[in-house]
């Protein structure tokens, strides 16, 4: 964290898998940390690197997960304000400790919780990305736009996707882009300058 804060050549992005927001479930998962441990790291990183971007992994419906455990996960999402998540519904894997655990969480409940998690993630992401409208970012252009092939796309130092009206020769270059709109997990902008 300190190195990233001091070095201008490293992206201000961390992927820190938390898995869930319940100490009880984290212990069952044998994760070796608590929610408080995780949050200390998040707060330290935010203090040292104000524009830092976080992504994480979340598992919904781990064996024995209660509504209270799941509520802890939702509370964690609200506090951290992740830029995006890699979310999964728990599925039994042969050979793991969890495979032999009783799983009282029904498939329907797992799906319902997963949908609530995704809805909250979208709400948080939409609000965060709206705050970037009007700001300028230096992006590294990596190719045609993902949602619109007539655009070009790159990532800023927070690992966020930015689409803009570009040209083929921009690929591999740094371009400064002013953000004009946001949509789910993508930002759209216009070219300001080229390095």
Sequence positions of predicted segments:
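AMP-binding (ANL) adenylation modules
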Residues: 91-94, 130
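Conserved non-cysteine loop/helix-boundary elements of the Radical SAM core domain that shape
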Residues: 1-84, 95-109
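Terminal RNA-binding accessory module
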Residues: 100-195
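Generic beta-strand/beta-sheet core signal
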Residues: 17-19, 55-57, 88-90, 142, ...
């Amino acid at each position: 964290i300190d190195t990233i804060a001091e070095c201008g050549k490293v992206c201000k992005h961390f992927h820190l898998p938390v898995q869930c927001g319940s100490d009880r479930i984290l212990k069952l998962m044998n994760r070796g940390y608590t929610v408080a441990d995780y949050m200390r790291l998040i707060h330290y990183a935010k203090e040292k690197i104000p524009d830092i971007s976080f992504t994480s992994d979340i598992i919904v419906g781990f064996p024995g997960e209660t509504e209270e455990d799941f509520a802890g996960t939702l509370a964690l999402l609200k506090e951290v304000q992740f830029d995006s998540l890699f979310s999964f519904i728990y599925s039994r894997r042969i050979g793991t400790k969890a495979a032999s655990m009783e799983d009282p969480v029904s498939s329907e409940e797992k799906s319902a919780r997963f949908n609530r998690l995704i809805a909250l993630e979208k709400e948080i992401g939409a609000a965060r990305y709206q705050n970037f409208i009007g700001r300028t970012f230096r992006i590294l252009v990596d190719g045609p736009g993902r949602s619109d092939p007539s655009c070009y796309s790159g990532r800023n130092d927070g690992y966020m996707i930015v689409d803009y009206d570009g040209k083929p020769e921009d690929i591999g270059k740094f371009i400064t882009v002013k953000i004009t709109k946001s949509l789910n997990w993508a930002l759209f902008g216009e070219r300001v300058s080229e390095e």
